[in-house]
Structure formats: structure tokens, C-alpha cells
């Protein structure tokens, strides 16, 4: 086995590395720069402790997650299913409810809310791969958001969105566009 193959195996088994790469654009390596990223960037800290708590249910991870949640207003349920390569851009007041499914390479930005409703469209959202959810955007209900979708800031989405789309406004309007996330979702894993 070559060195490159062994690094790929480590990368595939350690989901924290994907989040690190998405948020920094750099391959994780043990060193001072990586440690500075981990300690300085609360989005990386939250992603790390969130993954750790989901995997181990440890008390230490729960305490760290609770502290970061309270300090930065990050309310992401441990019962949500989040794929690899989560990107928390300007991570303040982000809410992801119980039962939500996020695919790989999803960008969540300040003030976005993703959750269930208990009336007409009962259930939680299922969001595909390579999705950008802008500032103060809201996605609610038993909806399916396709892959390669950009949800613009301040949009309210409570309906299904097909692949390769841009969603704008409140009420939301869907525009079909190939490569909708080009330039928005970077460093994909």
C-alpha cells in the first residue's frame, strides 16, 4: 500500500477531515497551523464536537457541544443526519431540527432554519448533495431539496425543489440553472 492510498483510507474513515477541508480549503495535517484552525474557528470546533457526540455520545462531547451551542446560537439536533463536508459559514443562529437529512457538501449560513412542521406538510426536510442555503433562509416541512441547489438569502421554502435549481424570494420562485452552486459551494469532497 502506498502512502497516498493509506492517506485516502484515513480520509475516508475520519469524517472530521472532510469538514476541516470544506471550511479551510486545506488538507488536514498534524501541525501548528491545523491546531490554530481548530482552536480559533468556532465553526470547526462545533463541527468536530457535533460529529464526536453523534459517534460516541460522550459526556465531554455533549458539554462542549452545549457550550458552543449556547455561545454561538447553533441549534443543530444530534438526531439530524448530516453528510460529510458540512460547511458552517458565519455560523451564528443556525437551526437544524430533529429528523432533518443533509447530504454531502451542504453550506449553512447565518440565521438559516431547517426544520419540521406539524401541520399540512408534516415531516422534516431531506436536502441533497452540493446545496447552498443562504443567510436567513428557511426550509420547512416534508420537502425534498435536490442536488446542486442554491437557496438564496431570505427565501422561504416549503415545497420540493428539483436538482440544478436556484430558489429566490418569499414566496419562493424556482429557476432551473445548470451548475447553480458554481462559486458558492467550494472545496467539495
Language model segments and positions:
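Terminal amphipathic alpha-helical/low-complexity segments used for targeting or macromolecular assembly
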Residues: 1-72, 181-189
Amino acid at each position: 500500500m502506498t502512502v497516498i492510498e493509506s492517506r485516502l483510507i484515513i480520509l475516508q474513515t475520519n469524517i472530521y477531515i472532510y469538514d476541516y477541508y470544506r471550511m479551510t480549503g486545506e488538507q488536514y495535517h498534524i501541525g501548528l497551523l491545523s491546531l490554530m484552525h481548530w482552536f480559533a474557528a468556532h465553526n470547526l470546533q462545533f463541527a468536530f464536537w457535533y460529529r464526536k457526540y453523534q459517534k460516541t455520545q460522550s459526556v465531554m462531547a455533549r458539554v462542549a457541544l452545549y457550550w458552543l451551542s449556547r455561545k454561538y446560537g447553533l441549534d443543530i439536533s444530534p438526531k439530524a443526519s448530516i453528510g460529510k463536508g458540512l460547511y458552517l459559514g458565519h455560523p451564528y443562529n443556525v437551526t437544524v431540527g430533529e429528523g432533518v437529512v443533509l447530504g454531502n457538501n451542504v453550506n449553512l449560513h447565518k440565521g438559516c432554519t431547517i426544520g419540521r412542521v406539524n401541520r399540512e406538510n408534516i415531516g422534516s426536510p431531506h436536502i441533497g448533495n452540493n446545496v447552498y442555503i443562504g443567510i436567513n433562509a428557511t426550509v420547512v416541512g416534508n420537502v425534498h431539496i435536490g442536488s446542486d441547489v442554491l437557496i438564496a438569502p431570505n427565501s422561504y421554502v416549503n415545497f420540493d425543489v428539483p436538482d440544478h435549481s436556484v430558489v429566490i424570494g418569499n414566496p419562493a420562485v424556482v429557476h432551473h440553472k445548470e451548475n447553480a452552486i458554481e462559486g458558492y459551494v467550494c472545496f467539495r469532497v
